[in-house]
Amino acid sequence: MKIIFMSPKKACLSILYALFTNTRKNEWIGPRVFDVWGLPTKRILKAYKLRLYPTVEQQARIDHTLDCCRFVFNHMLDRQQKIYTRRGEHMSAYDMQKVLTRMKNYLPWLRDADSKALKYACCQVEDAYKHFFKKQCGFPHFKKKRQCAASYTTTKGTSIHIEQRQVKLPLLGWIEARGGKIPDGVIKRATIQRSATGKYYASILM
């Protein structure tokens, strides 16, 4: 075993670097959160809500992705119910995403929607079943077309950018936005919502 001696100052800097960086990707991830025993815990994520003012074309793209996500969710939920009734099994999110890829061959209009949002809809079906089996909620139900409010989540954080009074979202490009000041940080995902009154919002998770 090789022993390395270093000055106290260099040792402190090495410890801080280990705490504030991702050792696998060598990325700066910010301070970690520690519990009462001084042990590192999961980082706390926070969502920031923005009011969106999309153009007519951007509204059409948002509405199309909302419709596609609802269709995928209902289709996968229907498959889950049939598989569980026949064999007592259920599909994983990965299995549903493979089915989704095949669906795009005979349902080409799915290709015009946000692909990450469609995959996330499959994850939502899996999560709904997990919560049901853990008795945390009721049995999953189908989403209605005429729901008062609708939303979808895009998970490609590297394609989401925020500047003064505008936000860039996958498939939509730059959209005029209003809201509170959002600090710099790593963006995980964004949830785009259409309210019952026809207003559009984006919830940015960091």
What residues fall within each predicted segment?
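Nucleic-acid substrate recognition interfaces
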Residues: 2-206
